[in-house]
Design a protein with these regions (language model features):
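Short acidic, glycine/proline-enriched helix-loop-strand junctions
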Residues: 23, 68-71, 138-142, 184-186
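Conserved anion-binding
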Residues: 45-120
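C-terminal helical cap(s) of enzyme catalytic domains, especially alpha/beta-barrels
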Residues: 60-68, 159-186
Length: 186
């Protein structure tokens, strides 16, 4: 493992994106200590997402919520069959998805990126029922759905289900969603 503070090329790229665009940057992956967050924020990230760290070191992750504020810390909740997966999806834990998210909501988290691993990159449609279940259980949580989006209709269905944000990639790369089609959601 390479500590985040030694990964100069990623910091340089993030810095260039931050200074040359008006994009809001969320940095995730490899956050293991407070210094990593400081560097991410100094390099232009407005938010950071912690997933594995929230499982492996909940005290540290909770301290980040207190120190940096819930508007800057996003919980990453990657799930396989409603169990939390960590370490780049290499390990599935015994922690149930919704109680895991609820526990951090009770500690101040206001945003979660929830990825249904089985659907990610598969273009089979998002896990709308799963996101509705989370929304029903934790109504004031800002849910960012991830995984499975294959069309603009999928995004519409998420919006209709009360899911305010979505992450997708493959549908853009494969031309199934055009950027111009997204303008109606702004």
């Amino acid at each position: 493992e390479i500590p985040l503070r030694l990964v100069g090329s990623e910091m340089c790229i993030r810095d260039r994106i931050a200074t040359r665009t008006s994009l809001i940057i969320d940095f995730g992956g490899g956050l293991k200590q407070e210094d990593d967050l400081e560097i991410a924020f100094e390099s232009g990230a407005q938010m950071v997402t912690g997933g594995s760290i929230a499982v492996k070191n909940p005290e540290m992750f909770t301290s980040w919520i207190s120190k940096f504020g819930s508007e800057k810390i996003i919980l990453g909740a990657d799930a396989k069959e409603k169990k939390i997966a960590i370490s780049g999806w290499e390990e599935t834990t015994s922690q149930e998805l919704i109680p895991f998210i609820k526990g951090y909501y009770d500690k101040g988290i206001t945003k979660v990126i929830c990825t249904d691993i089985a659907r990610d990159g598969m273009l089979q449609g998002p896990a709308i029922d799963l996101y509705k279940e989370i929304r029903d259980e934790i109504p004031f949580l800002y849910i960012i759905a991830s995984g499975g989006v294959s069309s603009i209709e999928d995004i519409e269905k998420l919006s209709e289900a009360g899911i305010p944000a979505v992450i997708f990639g493959k549908a853009i790369y494969e031309g199934k969603i055009q950027l111009k089609d997204l303008l109606r959601f702004t």
